């Protein structure tokens, strides 16, 4: 998408991994930073210059393993940064080890008899961390990807876009069912305020209590279906939890979006209030005031 702003207004901060080489491929202003710590670096950038549009580029290994704590707390604080998590369910840069999102039973160089780990669900983790914007898209769905980037850009607060991406070297076909000719039978595109239909209108999603189920539209009407509400946190948890479900379609689109005060705006207000009450102060005056300080 085109945002009508100068290149100098954007900063891209990445960690370590195949996805984190993004700054080299796209030639933006930014940092190829420390393994797992891109959200921390991006936080500093946003606080130092609030006018910048700050984007974090990470992967399922970098962002959810060594960087899981930074990922979680950046979203919890509602820092006004945009996190793009490229999920290919594998460690690619280190030549094909299983990652936090790899399936149970995944055979890799690190798990020759199959992974025993239960895969982590990025949207569910983000919602649990109280993120204010959570979305998912697919690398091959270019128009949809562009829409999600635009929504994230205009969201005032911390945002996560999980991007399903194929790794044709170490995990080829990871998301083939969502990009093949029959993808519309396997994916549901979430649209705020609209009934949940998929498979070109032939199937829908209905709630049985708290459990979503697939129904045949020849036997049901739109009034029977679950209506997506991206402002409903309870519904967002339900939608996120049917990720990689054996029967339900994979949800893509905006899962959750609400407005809350951002950490960076609250911090600026707090500093301004303190300066107004006590004056700006000088670091040198503090250093020259003696060897001890009284904390009141």
Where does each model-flagged region fall?
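Metallocofactor- and cofactor-centric catalytic cores in central/energy metabolism, strongly enriched
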Residues: 1-20, 26, 34-36, 49, ...
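Glycine-rich beta-alpha junction loops
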Residues: 16-18, 88-90, 141, 164-169, ...
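Thiamine diphosphate
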Residues: 16-92, 144-146
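Conserved thiamine diphosphate
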Residues: 51, 99-154
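Active-site-proximal loop->helix
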Residues: 68-75, 93-106, 125
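ATP/pyrophosphate-binding catalytic subdomain of soluble kinases
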Residues: 132-189
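Flexible, low-complexity linker and terminal segments
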Residues: 169-296
